[in-house]
């Protein structure tokens, strides 16, 4: 299958929750380190810094080994059960965190983390109004897309009225 066929099937079968930057996005078949490869074997340098993979590199061997080791022991289990990897990671984070940050709450995605942060802030302050940065990206849920000010990253106009967008700081 070539890139054009993949793009066509993507458009046909996937819900358009987020608009793409390009008319013809790269149909990625492989990724290693900071490089992407399309269906035709063309190589591209991945400059997209908004996703965690680029900070450690695609198909990072050390990360892959750790994942395989964990999968061989325990793939997924409800957060209702305590597990050694989770409590060890929480303890490590608490020991690294400044001040009185002594509790962890793990989520499966950035969107879920943003939703949880909003919920915690509203519970703590009693306020329902939110301030989000104009150039921030928060995810694909309704609240997360409302926090996101880029129209191309939203499927719908902002639905949550209590959100105000502030200019992102310019440090240069």
What are these regions (language model features)?
Residues 1-32:
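Active-site-adjacent loop/helix segments that line or gate small-molecule/cofactor pockets in enzymes
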Residues 10, 14, 18, 71-78, ...:
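Structural signal for hydrophobic packing residues in well-ordered secondary-structure cores
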Residues 25-46:
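Active-site and channel-lining beta-strand-loop segments
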Residues 44, 50-80, 90-107, 168-169:
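Glycine-rich phosphate-binding segment of PLP-dependent enzymes
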Residues 49-50, 147:
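Residue-level structural signal for beta-strand termini and adjacent loop
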Residues 83-87:
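PLP-dependent aminotransferase class I/II
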Residues 91-172:
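PLP-dependent aspartate aminotransferase-fold enzymes
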């Amino acid at each position: 299958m070539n890139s054009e066929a993949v793009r066509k099937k993507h458009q046909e079968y996937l819900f358009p929750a987020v608009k793409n930057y390009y008319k013809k996005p790269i149909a990625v078949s492989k990724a290693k380190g900071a490089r992407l490869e399309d269906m035709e074997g063309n190589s591209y340098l991945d400059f997209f810094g908004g996703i965690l993979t680029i900070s450690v590199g695609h198909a990072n061997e050390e990360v892959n080994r750790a994942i395989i080791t964990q999968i061989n022991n325990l793939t997924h289990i409800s957060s209702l059960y305590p597990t050694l990897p989770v409590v060890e990671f929480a303890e490590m984070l608490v020991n690294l965190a400044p001040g009185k940050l002594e509790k962890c709450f793990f989520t499966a995605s950035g969107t879920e983390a943003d939703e949880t942060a909003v919920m915690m802030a509203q519970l703590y302050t009693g306020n329902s109004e939110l301030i989000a940065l104009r150039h921030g990206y928060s995810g694909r849920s309704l609240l997360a897309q409302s926090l996101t000010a880029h129209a191309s990253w939203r499927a719908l106009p902002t639905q949550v009225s209590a959100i105000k967008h502030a200019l992102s700081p310019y440090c240069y």
